[in-house]
């Protein structure tokens, strides 16, 4: 899955992981992964 990570200072990053977005428990794991990787993110959106 791919996410756009927004930070409070205005910059953004794209982050991808290898979870299958069509499988619910993998989609949940992908979100857990991105939140753990970017704990200081202001906003995270799925791309």
Feature names for model-found ranges:
Residues 11-25:
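A short, exposed loop/beta-hairpin motif centered on an aromatic-Gly-Thr core
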Residues 3, 29-30:
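Amphipathic alpha-helical segments in structured regions that serve as interaction surfaces
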Residues 1-8:
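A short beta-strand micro-motif
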Residues 31-47:
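Short, mixed-charge low-complexity intrinsically disordered segments
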């Amino acid at each position: 899955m791919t996410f756009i990570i927004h930070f409070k200072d205005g910059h953004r990053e794209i982050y991808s992981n290898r979870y299958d977005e069509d499988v619910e428990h993998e989609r949940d794991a992908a979100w857990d992964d991105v939140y753990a990787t970017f704990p200081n993110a202001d906003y995270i959106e799925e791309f």
